[in-house]
Amino acid sequence: MSNSHLEKIKKLNYIPVGLGNGEFDKEWVRDNTLENISYKNSWYGENTFYYWLWKNNLNKNFDKEWVGFCHYRRFWTQNSVEKKNEILLKSILQKVPNEWKNHEVVLREDFFVNSSKLSKILKHGKKQLLKNPFVFLSKRTMTIKVHYDMYHGYGELDKAIELLDDQNREGFRNFVNTQGSFNANNIFICKSPKLYADYCDVLFKWLKKCEELFGFDRAREYSRIRVYAFLSERFLSYWFKKNSNYIVWPLKFHDISNDKINF
């Protein structure tokens, strides 16, 4: 994101957050102030802001009933609105729906890993095809782990799981080896500061250990450089489903960068 997005975000009544070493005006909330890991943004993605929020006046930032996150290309929608509606202000979420009343966490609707196109499977899944040519033909065998190995580094998820704490290691291993969908993009909405803090405590302790394995290599290809974001993306789904009363909610892709209709 950049300063060019500022007025658009303000028009949507959202709070703009600038990540990493980009130049942002003073109206932006920054992840490089106070206690932070902003310098890791290229590898951690949006997690550098989640860390900042966790470490700096967490309860103050949770002064409303819910705290939620989205991207400049992905927005929570009103449940009854058609996703293809081009009028963004009429389709995105602006208030807490009644359906959330008895829930603690909102996760985006599931992304199913068996939706990969054949061309991408042939390009990224060579090792899996050599090991088991039928792995992509069955919903049962096309799991989160197979998908991760194909796109983000063969065998790296297994290595990372070994570094998880005893309370989550086997549960997360079972999750990625048996499930065919997860709640992608590291986007969620949370009602409880304690729940948010508990998640961050487990997540960032794990990712810190993973740094000893994967480091901060800028030479990694694009689909692998954000290794800690990709790991947390899968872990987020597992952890909140295990530890919270959650609800799944629709998300729409809408890039505001070149939007001439709404702005």
Task: Pin down the residues of each PLM region.
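ER/Golgi luminal nucleotide-sugar-dependent glycosyltransferases, focusing on the catalytic module
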Residues: M1-F263
